[in-house]
């Protein structure tokens, strides 16, 4: 069976989050691994329950890599990478919701890059929000 950790995270996504996670997975900025994209596409057929015999690792491998000899280590790596993306997505969603911390992080980065004018502009905006 596919990793219960990965399926546990995915099963808790709302339909909107699951769809958005698919966009996250397919974004070349966040993921360049085509196998991870294919695994997401395969798993979405089973959302949200993820209870099916077709989730056995050998069956998943056969569907993703038709005609190739089963390689547990390779499949586990693909599953692990999708799991890491799910964790990154959750962190990203949380980051987007927290305007204050997002602003503080932006200020740190602007300051580090010595972008004083832009820093002062955003500093004033953030100060007003506090």
Regions found by a protein language model. Name each.
Residues 1-130:
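Flexible inter-repeat linkers and adjacent short helices
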């Amino acid at each position: 069976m596919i990793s219960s950790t990965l399926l546990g995270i995915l099963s808790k996504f709302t339909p909107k989050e699951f769809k958005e996670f698919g966009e996250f997975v397919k974004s070349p900025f966040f993921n360049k691994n085509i196998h991870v994209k294919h695994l997401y596409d395969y798993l979405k057929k089973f959302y949200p329950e993820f209870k099916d015999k077709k989730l056995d690792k050998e069956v998943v491998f056969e569907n993703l890599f038709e005609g190739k000899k089963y390689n547990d280590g390779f499949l586990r790596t693909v599953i692990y990478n999708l799991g890491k993306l799910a964790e990154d997505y959750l962190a990203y969603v949380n980051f987007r919701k927290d305007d204050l911390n997002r602003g503080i992080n932006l200020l740190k980065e602007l300051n580090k890059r010595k972008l004083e004018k832009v820093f002062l502009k955003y500093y004033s905006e953030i100060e007003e929000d506090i």
